[in-house]
Amino acid sequence: MDDAITIRGLRKAYGGRAAVDGLDLDIRTGEVFALLGPNGAGKTTTVEIAEGFRSRDAGEVRVLGTDPEGAGRSWRNQIGIVTQTSAGLDLLTPREALASTAKVYSGPRDVDEVIAAVGLADKADTRIVGLSGGQRRRLDVGLGIVGGPELIFLDEPTTGFDPQARRDFWTLIRALADQGTTILLTTHY
């Protein structure tokens, strides 16, 4: 089994203050890996560098065999991203948002399957503006998996989840891992 993510000597500073200082990390294909730590520990910075959305000051990063800083569309087609917050979709329904996002991928999952997987079947045709915080978070997870990615980045994915939603989320993560999906997530707990 190959490494999905390899990081060596990763460094990133903001205004002279190190957010990440010399991180080495290997995540195997199909592994579920969590970065655990308090606010300001560099978890989100590390994930954003691995996603290719933030530049690094030093170090080597390979994600699915590619340096994310120069990665193209075919590489991005292999990853799913769930950020800490999302916005701009309030006038759509979850079904519309997922269907729209699915169109940018070459092999997306079935939208109704994703809606069921994230527990939004009863809210699929409700405007997103009318969803609770936990329901919006479930939609964020759906948006991250609808492309059928090989690798999913989840930044604080269970924020706003009630206990049952959190259990359902971990069941979904186990199912994705059982299908061979690599998962990198950040969490405080």
Question: What do these predicted regions represent?
Answer:
Residues 166-179:
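Helical segment within the ABC ATPase nucleotide-binding domain
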Residues 152-155:
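Catalytic Walker B motif of ABC-type/P-loop ATPase nucleotide-binding domains
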Residues 51:
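Helix-to-loop junction immediately C-terminal to a conserved catalytic motif
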Residues 59-70, 74-75:
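Conserved ABC transporter NBD signature motif
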Residues 99, 103, 108-124:
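Conserved ABC ATPase "signature" region
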Residues 141:
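Hydrophobic anchor residue at the start of the ABC signature
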